[in-house]
Amino acid sequence: MATASGPAGIAMGSVGSLLERQDFSPEELRAALAGSRGSRQPDGLLRKGLGQREFFSYLHLPKKDGKTAKRAPRNEPDYTTLYYREHPRAGDFSKTSLPERGRFDKCRIRPSVFKPPVSTGKGFLSMQSLAAHKGQKLWRSNGSLHTLACHPPLSPGPRASQARAQLLHALSLDEGGPEPSLSDSSSGGSFGRSPGTGPSPFSSSLGHINHLGGSLDRASRSPKESGPLAVLSCLPEPPPPYEFSCPTTEEVAVLPDTCEELKRDLGDQDVSNPFTQVLEERQRLWLSELKRLYVDRLHEVAQKAERSERNLQLQLFMAQQEQRRLRKELRAQQGLAPEPRTSGPPMEADPNARPEEEARWEVCQKTAEISLLKQQLREAQAELAQKLAEIFSLKTQLRGSRAQAQAQDAELARLREAVRSLQEQAPREEAPGSCETDDCKSRGLLGEAGGNEAREGAEQLRAELLQERLRGQEQALRFEQERQTWQEEKERVLRYQREIQGSYMDMYRRNQALEQELRVLREPPTSWSPRLESSKI
């Protein structure tokens, strides 16, 4: 064991002289925490942190004065008194206490970095709630465990309280105790979580950060102070606050966002900062864990897909077997022969019998021809309907022209009668011309002028009547030509329909013959049945 001289010139003793073993022996710690390590929750999972009862049993361990009297001689110096003489503010953890220079100078992390990402509900129990139940608030000290150890209501006695404060303070100086926010976040992640949620990823990594902080703190101390702390560094580590358990999928999904937040918070610090290196290492570990979880999930999904594919193939095979069975039953009910097996030796084909495939091909070809003829028949019927509509319109026009011609003939007859009456009146007026006076001559001249006008009107009417007759004759001739044309078209369409009907009958007979041949080909040949020859198509 290493020894060092104190300020009073007294040599350092063993570790047992500095610690009160009746309070903090490793066997008693293991016995007090034995129930919390191997305990399980009602659902079969491991409990992730210490309960309230285990924690108080950890703080209030029973004293064993007999073992202390046997192990430590009475002539040993009182190192507690010497420690408080040398460090008058070692156990002062009040609100106004400030850390001494050189003893607490180490790289700190901001309190907002390691806050728990998920807040818990009713079961939240932190170190501050345990220590401040009397209304006293904890200030930013070197850890909530230190404050709990030095709190008057929780300490069993003044001497034990001083020894516990001395031990915890020395351990915090040697191991680099975390910040209050760091300790609170770790304790909140350990004690305040419900059984359903996993441990916080930051509380599981605080041991590495504290270890680095303690190394930096030891480097900044003086050789005089590093002696007793080197002795205390050989002590066994306290039990872990919770047992390790695999992180859940939700926590693993939150890890990249947490890493980004830590990078932003620590961006103003130096790259060579050990905390930054530790956090980067934790980030790499988290990413590898995330990839592993993703690979496992993909493997599981692939296995499920493979199993479902095998099940579907099995169901498809069963459906095919059922379909074959149903076909056989249907064929047996219809009285047809079963399908020839392809696995057996091929039967010799009859050279005189027509192949079934050729007969089927001919049937398909004739069916196509029938459909083409049907299409042509529909087109001819549509054209015939159009021609009939045109004939009806021409007949209507002819009827109108005939009525107009009759009206013109009646007008012409009336004009002829008027001209004849005028011609009969003219000689009567010319006979007594000798005895007429000048007045009569003048009247005769007027009548002659009126007769000339009537003759001109009659000639004009004759010319118009002649034109109308010629026009009527021309229309009648044109109508007769159209009638003859439509009669020829009608005869042609009727002849075409008769031909199509005859072709339909021929096609029907051919189809009947082909069906008979197919029926003969499908039936097994017998010795007594005559062979049917196919008719020529």
Swiss-Prot record:
Keywords: Cell projection, Coiled coil, Cytoplasmic vesicle, Developmental protein, Neurogenesis, Phosphoprotein
Chief place of localization: cytoplasm
InterPro entries named in the record: N4BP3
Modified residues (Phosphoserine): 172
Domain of life where this protein originates: Eukaryota
Biased composition (Low complexity): 178-207
GO biological process: innate immune response; nervous system development
Keyword Phosphoprotein among UniProt keywords: yes
Location within or outside the cell: Cytoplasmic vesicle; Cell projection, Axon; Cell projection, Dendrite
Annotated coiled-coil segments of the chain: 295-523
Residue ranges of the region described as Disordered: 173-234, 327-359, 422-456
GO cellular component, one term: axon
Stated role: Plays a positive role in the antiviral innate immune signaling pathway. Mechanistically, interacts with MAVS and functions as a positive regulator to promote 'Lys-63'-linked polyubiquitination of MAVS and thus strengthens the interaction between MAVS and TRAF2. Also plays a role in axon and dendrite arborization during cranial nerve development. May also be important for neural crest migration and early development of other anterior structures including eye, brain and cranial cartilage.
Family recorded in the similarity comment: Belongs to the N4BP3 family.
Subunit: Binds NEDD4. Interacts with 14-3-3 proteins. Interacts with MAVS.
PANTHER family attached to this UniProt entry: NEDD4-BINDING PROTEIN 3 (PTHR32274:SF1)
Protein name, entry field: Nedd4 binding protein 3
UniProt gene name: N4bp3
